[in-house]
């Protein structure tokens, strides 16, 4: 105990001295993690990358070392992911390492699809991507600092000549992903795609740009009937040349194809792999023509049992194929991933949905031989709970370490599309947290919901908070039942510092009343709760981020805790105090799916408000409780190591994106980390940058003369002030752990049952003047 006590003293002294000498610089966040995550026997290599839903893969040299690194563009969220090709920890072999710094090198307005191909033969992969209306635009990769990519727009609209001297856009439609490859062997990149009108026939565009390698200035349409095949409405159904027409009166699938050309049988001609929207199969179509340009696809060469009847590709919706060396053996493998734009109608699982088919061929030029090697390429090394993840942190097992709950929008499990709550127990130490998956259905919420299939159980968003002031964390969760969204709570019947005891049979839900005479305020799908003492009365209040666009007000609602006035009825604990708290806007309009989090992120002793919107915007409102009316905040929060500048978040954008945020000081270093739940079902971990660990005491501190002793303390501490004050104790996530005391000059703080770590003691005088200091609770 004495050694631990002295360690705390040394840590506090070193930190205080270092911070006193540090220059005053802007606060922000940088990607990084303090915790490991273990599932089964595996430590997740990319635990905090944020999950993947619909990645489109390409290779590119990101760091200028001459090795092929990996780029993934997630279609659903329009987010870029970058992975470096690095040496394995064992010293032999290679592995992928998530490296988010490189994501900022790619254009921020990408959408639809993005593929990297070297069109000018300079050894640097260029960028082909969707343009508005279904056109294709191209960015040239020029040499950047340190050999890193730098993209410059080379052609904002590919085109080709048509009759009578007219020029037409090379338009592939909004849902197709083309094959961009050298089809005729002249060294130039050509384009094969389904037509933009109905996506029923294949069109081949040959690159005729000048030069031995060419560019992207000139294309001609070689044929609008490549392969002499027409797709039929049924999955894996085609009308081949000379065959009967497609069967009528079948259910039509939405137009959309993702294609890849590969020589699958070693005859020197490129064959076709075709993935279709709303279809699970990847169809192989062998080329029986005289050349790749003069392709001929036949019924005899078509198979939906690819690559083998024993292990065919079968994804729930819209498989898209990609060819690259995924396992570092020098032979290109096949990776297949979903390629739909969203999951709002399909209701499929987005976990373990990226298939890696290892190529067992002896060389890159040999006939490929694909076999299933992984059902979750990269995903299996990430925290990934399917989609719409939302975290909450707290000590659930009473061991003094912070555990993690991770909820999701929903997942398809055993035929039921239901939300669930994952429980990750912290099995590490106070300074080195390690999360181990303990349950993928904490409290059996998903299993119980599956017993009532007619009632939805989706958009689960948890919070851990002491509602009844007994020192034990209670569970609150927002959930959508198909008609309304409820804020459900379950009181913890265990004593403080003991393993949590939640009974779903005792679950109830808040009935927050509106302003006088307005009645109950409706709740919408995706509403996200956050608890914090807003008015400083010692009772935790409710901030509700909402997607409500019908009711008057804004996206952030402030519900005040009535305290004793509620008469002990937790159902009616909260009353609407402000329906448009902070008057928050995102680019001039009401931010959708707003998710709030409160903590002292910048270390100045004052709580800050952080919000995420469904557009991927992250805002920080420092010391928000001192602001009135429209809150002033910033979105330039995330440090770019390449430019040494702060930039807005790059979490993606889309029609419906659901994010969530939570703060937790997992390693007890005095700075809360930021954890962002993503639409893609994962978590991103950010560390504070240039925050203050021990906040400098302002002028008010001199007037109140707050003194804490002993500090560190184990069981109790004394707080003294020069004038009568009320004292409260918060953890670094902003949660009230000891309520307000009566006005006095001397206060005894009971620390029994508190987890070791740093806390904030706030002393407030009768006139509202307040000051804060950090208190270390020793083991």
Show which residues each predicted segment covers.
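Short glycine/acidic-enriched loop and turn motifs that connect beta-strands
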Residues: 77-78, 134-135, 197-200, 278-280, ...
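Acidic/hydrophobic-patterned starts of short beta strands in beta-sheet-rich repeat architectures
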Residues: 64-74, 121-130, 185-195, 266-276, ...
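Beta-strand-rich domains and repeat architectures in extracellular enzymes and scaffolds
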Residues: 38-75, 253-262
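Short consensus segments that form the blades of beta-propeller domains
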Residues: 46-49, 72-73, 129, 167-169, ...
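Blade-level signature of beta-propeller repeat domains, shared across WD40, Kelch, NHL, RCC1
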Residues: 652-694
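C-terminal outer-membrane/trafficking sorting elements
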Residues: 6-8, 699-709, 713-779
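Blade-edge motifs of beta-propeller repeat domains
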Residues: 21-51, 86-109, 142-172, 209-253, ...
């Amino acid at each position: 105990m004495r050694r631990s006590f002295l360690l705390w003293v040394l840590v506090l002294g070193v930190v205080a001295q270092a911070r006193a000498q540090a220059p005053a610089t802007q606060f922000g966040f940088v990607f990084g993690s303090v915790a490991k995550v273990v599932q089964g026997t595996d430590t997740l290599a990319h635990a905090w990358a944020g999950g993947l839903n619909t990645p489109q893969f390409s290779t590119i040299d990101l760091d200028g070392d001459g090795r092929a690194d990996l780029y993934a563009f997630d279609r659903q969220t329009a987010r870029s992911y970058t992975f470096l090709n690095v040496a394995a920890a064992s010293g032999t072999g290679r592995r992928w390492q998530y490296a988010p710094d490189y994501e900022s090198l790619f254009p921020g307005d990408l959408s639809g699809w993005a593929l990297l191909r070297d069109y000018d033969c300079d050894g640097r992969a260029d960028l082909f991507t969707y343009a508005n209306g279904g056109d294709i635009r191209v960015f040239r990769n020029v040499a950047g600092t340190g050999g890193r990519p730098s993209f410059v727009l080379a052609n904002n609209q590919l085109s080709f000549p048509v009759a009578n001297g007219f020029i037409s856009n090379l338009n592939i439609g909004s849902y197709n992903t083309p094959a961009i490859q050298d089809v005729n062997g002249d060294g130039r990149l050509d384009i094969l795609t389904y037509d933009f009108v109905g996506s029923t026939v294949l069109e081949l565009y040959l690159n005729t740009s000048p030069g031995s390698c060419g560019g992207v200035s000139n294309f001609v349409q070689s044929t609008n009937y490549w392969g002499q095949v027409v797709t039929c409405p049924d999955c894996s159904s085609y009308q081949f040349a000379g065959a009967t027409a497609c069967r009528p009166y079948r259910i039509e699938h939405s137009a959309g194809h993702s294609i890849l050309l590969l020589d699958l049988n070693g005859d020197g001609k490129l064959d076709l792999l075709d993935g279709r929207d709303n279809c699970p199969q990847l169809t192989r179509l062998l080329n029986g023509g005289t050349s790749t340009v003069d392709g001929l696809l036949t019924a005899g060469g078509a198979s939906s049992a690819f690559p083998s009847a024993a292990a065919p590709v079968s994804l729930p919706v819209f498989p898209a194929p990609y060819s690259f060396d995924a396992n570092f053996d020098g032979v290109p493998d096949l990776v297949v991933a979903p390629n739909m734009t969203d999951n709002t109608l399909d209701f499929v699982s987005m976990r373990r949905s990226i298939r890696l088919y290892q190529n067992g061929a002896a060389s890159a030029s040999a006939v490929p031989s694909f076999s299933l090697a992984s059902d979750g390429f990269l995903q299996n090394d990430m925290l990934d709970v399917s989609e719409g993840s939302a975290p909450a942190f707290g000590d659930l097992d009473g061991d003094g370490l912070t555990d993690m709950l991770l909820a999701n929008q929903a997942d398809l499990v055993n035929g039921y599309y239901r939300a669930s709550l994952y429980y990750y127990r912290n099995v590490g130490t106070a300074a080195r947290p390690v999360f181990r998956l303990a349950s993928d259905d904490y409290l059996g919420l998903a299993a119980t919901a599956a017993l009532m299939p007619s009632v939805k159980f989706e958009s689960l968003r948890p919070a851990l908070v002491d509602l009844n002031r007994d020192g034990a964390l209670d569970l609150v969760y927002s959930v959508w039942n198909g008609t309304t969204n409820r804020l459900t709570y379950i009181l913890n019947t265990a004593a403080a510092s003991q393993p949590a005891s939640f009974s779903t049979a005792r679950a109830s839900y808040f009935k927050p009343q509106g302003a006088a005479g307005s009645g109950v305020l409706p709740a919408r799908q995706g509403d996200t709760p956050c608890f914090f003492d807003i008015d400083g009365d010692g009772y935790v209040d409710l901030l509700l981020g909402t997607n409500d666009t019908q009711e008057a007000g804004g996206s952030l609602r402030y519900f005040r805790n009535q305290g004793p006035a509620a008469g002990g009825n937790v159902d009616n604990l909260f009353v609407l105090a402000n329906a448009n708290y902070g008057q928050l806007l995102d680019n001039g309009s009401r931010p959708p799916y707003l998710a709030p989090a409160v903590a002292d992120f910048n270390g100045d002793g004052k709580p800050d408000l952080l919000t995420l919107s469904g557009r991927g915007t992250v805002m920080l409102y420092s010391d928000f409780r001192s602001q009135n009316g429209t809150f002033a905040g910033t979105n330039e929060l995330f440090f770019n190591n390449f430019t040494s500048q702060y930039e807005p978040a790059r979490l993606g954008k889309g029609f419906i994106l659901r994010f969530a945020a939570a703060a937790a000081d997992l390693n007890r270093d005095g700075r809360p980390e930021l954890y962002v739940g993503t639409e893609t079902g994962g978590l991103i971990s950010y560390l504070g940058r240039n925050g203050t660990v021990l906040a400098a005491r302002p002028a008010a501190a001199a007037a109140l003369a707050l003194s804490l002793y002993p500090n560190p303390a184990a069981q109790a501490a004394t707080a003294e002030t020069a004038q009568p004050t009320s004292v409260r104790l918060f953890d670094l996530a902003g949660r009230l752990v000891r309520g307000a005391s009566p006005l006095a000059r001397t206060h005894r703080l009971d620390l029994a049952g508190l987890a070791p770590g740093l806390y904030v003691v706030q002393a407030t005088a009768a006139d509202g003047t307040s000051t804060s200091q950090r208190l270390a609770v020793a083991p």
